[in-house]
Regions:
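Active-site and donor-binding regions of nucleotide-sugar-utilizing enzymes
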Residues: 1, 7-18, 22-23, 46, ...
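Conserved nucleotide-sugar phosphate-binding/catalytic loop shared by glycosyltransferases and other
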Residues: 25-69
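A nucleotide-sugar donor-handling region in carbohydrate enzymes
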Residues: 37, 41, 60, 135-210, ...
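Donor-nucleotide binding loops and adjacent catalytic segments primarily
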Residues: 44-47, 182-268
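Short acidic-hydrophobic, aromatic-tinged amphipathic segments that line or gate anion-handling sites
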Residues: 57-60, 144, 253-256, 309-314
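Glycine-rich phosphate-binding loop signature in dinucleotide/nucleotide-binding domains
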Residues: 80-87, 192-193, 268, 354
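A donor-sugar binding/catalytic signature common to diverse glycosyltransferases
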Residues: 91-92, 103, 114-115, 142, ...
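Leloir-type glycosyltransferase catalytic cores
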Residues: 145-148, 176, 309-356
Length: 356
């Protein structure tokens, strides 16, 4: 794992491996985090919330510079594999650590498994696009979440025997935790009611660096809805909004929430505005209207058959879709194929050579 969101996808995998081992299967796993055990993005309750073990090892590579981080992971993960040999290295998503660890494994003659393979933005200026393409090209097992990802891989000449449509593993985590969610303490203090607030998440620096665009987006939100707006934001985002004078009596800015508390806010929202692909997927699973501040979706199924709409960075489009939401005319979504909570089981069965 290379970042906090990766753990939402490794948690069900660790449980599936534990279950397979308990059933007598010859399988063990070692969880590696490329960052530090003092990483402030990993809240103290994260691993308890996800019901998963803490990483077995932290590589302590925290550089923000791409090349230094890449080099640090290459060296540290090579040392890890020398000390703890593996038959398969499974990497998640499309981050710099994903690519770096797959390169190390391949150079050492170890099989690479890519979880959430085949996602494409078709924009080579996006670092994630390069990371994903390189990782997919090195992988022996390509675990996909949807048929669009399968098609992307097919179009690049990937051997179909290596592609395994296992479903969306994030849904495994969502299904597992639906009865474990925790109402944030601030929920009652703010006087919020379920299905009567708009949830807003914002993280991407590319948008935060565009002052005029950001102000126009918030203007559209505040003009087009009279509901409370709940926004769990990192300090750098909060400071940016403050510097731009973006404020309202209906805008409730919270600190980043623990996993189960944030899940509660997502589950009970009237609508969601986000720049997170994971949140958009969760919204489709829950049938909640979602407006994504991006021009592409990692899983296009959230748009074609789910509840997600891409608005890019256009305040005009956002205003239009908020009108649709206000009128109660949002599209009724459906669950994409294999969003059934069994992706992790399929992955383990495939690695054991048992999946049909």
């Amino acid at each position: 794992a290379g970042a906090r969101p990766n753990f939402m996808k490794t948690a069900p995998l660790m449980r599936a491996i534990k279950a397979a081992k308990a059933a007598g299967k010859n399988i063990t796993a070692r969880l590696v985090y490329t960052g530090s055990d003092e990483d402030k993005s990993l809240e103290p309750s994260l691993f308890t919330d996800l019901d998963m073990p803490r990483p077995d090892v932290y590589l302590h590579v925290d550089n923000t510079d791409f090349f230094q981080r890449m080099a640090g992971i290459l060296v540290a993960f090579a040392r890890e594999l020398e000390q703890h040999p593996a038959q398969v290295v499974l990497v998640v998503d499309d981050l710099t650590p994903t690519m770096a660890c797959s390169i190390v494994a391949k150079k050492k003659g170890i099989k690479v498994a890519h979880l959430v393979a085949g996602t494409r933005s078709f924009d080579m200026d996006m670092p994630k696009e390069v990371n994903s393409m390189i990782t997919d090209g090195l992988s022996d097992y390509l675990f996909t979440a949807g048929m669009v990802a399968n098609r992307n891989l097919n179009q690049t000449g990937t051997e179909q025997a290596h592609v395994h449509f296992v479903g969306n593993i994030l849904i495994d985590t969502l299904r597992y935790n639906r009865t474990r969610l925790q109402r944030p303490v601030a929920f009652s203090i703010m006087g919020l009611k379920e299905k009567e607030y708009l949830l807003l998440t914002l993280n991407k620096h590319s948008l935060l660096n565009k002052d005029t665009t950001l102000k126009a987006i918030f203007r559209a939100i505040l003009e087009k809805t009279d509901k409370p707006i709940v926004a769990p934001l990192h300090t750098y985002v909060k400071n940016k909004l403050s510097a731009l004078g973006i404020t309202s009596e209906r805008l409730y800015i919270l600190p980043p929430q623990p996993y189960l508390s944030f899940g509660y806010l997502v589950n009970h929202a009237w609508g969601i505005i986000t720049d997170s692909g994971n949140v958009a997927e969760e919204a489709t699973f829950l049938g909640i209207p979602c407006m994504t501040l991006s021009t592409y979706a990692e899983h296009p199924e959230t748009v074609t058959i789910g509840t997600n709409r891409l608005v890019g960075e256009s305040s005009e489009i956002l205003a239009d879709v908020l009108d649709i939401l206000n009128k109660g005319e949002w599209q009724k979504g459906h669950l994409p194929e294999r969003w059934d909570g069994h992706a992790a089981e399929r992955i383990v069965q495939t690695l054991l050579g048992e999946h049909k």
